[in-house]
């Protein structure tokens, strides 16, 4: 089975700042994975590598492969990888209607523009995806009039419209109240139970659904651990990762943290 992501000895800069030096990381498609780390650990840069927004420094001894390929046309990559990020929600076109939010996924744009066109099959696919997520009554509503949770679910539908092999979720419950968080996480769990692979990027342990089995710890631009969730998510490891005393409590398959 192909690896979702394979990085070897990659050095990556954001502007003049080096975020990764000789980074090596594998994420397999045989299971769902959570990438955990404090702010500044390199999580956002890793997401940009996945989405081909940035590239590593060229070297004959390094590579970044996504589904075993180093070079992608971004529009083709979206058929394999659907990304839902908090930053996209913040920057999305406010006056876009619900249907157009989902249709924009076919172009990877943050709105629908006059030069874009859609086939009947694409429109029907968008509508069926909206319906599957229980959003059909909002199909004609403007994005800016929706609740944060409704917006997040429309962006999830936008990512799903290609039926990608893998969903990448960046801090999935950020900005959501408890009720919306629980509903959104249940949607994610439903997708995983139906066979969808998830890569979840977060610094909030409570966002990690029980179905995720693999964990990557990222700190200061380095992978400090990569292994099974039940072995890595413990009080000592998280205390070391976040450099503050933490106690871990497990309930109903979820992990919670409290001050140590």
Language model features with spans:
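Catalytic Walker B motif of ABC-type/P-loop ATPase nucleotide-binding domains
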Residues: 167-171
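Conserved ABC ATPase signature
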Residues: 116-118, 142-146
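Conserved ABC ATPase "signature" region
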Residues: 103, 118-138
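Conserved structural motif at the start of ABC-family nucleotide-binding domains
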Residues: 5, 19-22
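ABC ATPase nucleotide-binding domains
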Residues: 239-260
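A short, surface-exposed alpha-helical micro-motif characterized by mixed small hydrophobic
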Residues: 208-210
């Amino acid at each position: 089975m192909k690896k979702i992501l394979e990085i070897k000895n990659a050095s990556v800069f954001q502007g003049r700042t080096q975020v990764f030096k000789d980074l090596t990381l594998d994420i397999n498609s045989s299971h769902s994975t959570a990438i955990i780390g404090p702010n500044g650990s390199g999580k956002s840069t890793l997401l940009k590598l996945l989405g081909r927004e940035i590239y590593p420094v060229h070297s004959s001894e390094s590579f970044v492969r996504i589904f075993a390929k180093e070079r992608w046309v971004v529009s083709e990559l979206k058929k394999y990888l659907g990304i839902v990020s908090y930053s996209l929600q913040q920057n999305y076109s406010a006056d876009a209607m619900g249907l157009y939010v989902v249709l924009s996924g076919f172009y990877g744009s943050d709105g629908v523009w006059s030069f874009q066109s859609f086939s009947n099959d694409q429109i029907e696919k968008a509508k069926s995806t909206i319906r599957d997520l229980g959003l059909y009554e909002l199909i004609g509503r403007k994005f800016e009039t929706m609740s944060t949770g409704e917006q997040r679910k429309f962006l999830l539908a936008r990512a799903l419209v290609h039926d990608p092999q893998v969903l990448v979720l960046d801090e999935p419950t950020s900005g959501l109240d408890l009720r919306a968080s629980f509903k959104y996480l249940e949607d994610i769990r439903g997708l995983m139970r139906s066979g969808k692979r998830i890569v979840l990027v977060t610094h909030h342990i409570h966002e990690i659904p029980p179905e995720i089995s693999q964990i990557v710890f990222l700190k200061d631009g380095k992978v400090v651990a990569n292994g099974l969730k039940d072995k890595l998510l413990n009080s000592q490891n998280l205390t070391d990762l976040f450099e503050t005393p933490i106690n871990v409590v497990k309930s109903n398959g979820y992990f919670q943290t409290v001050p140590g």
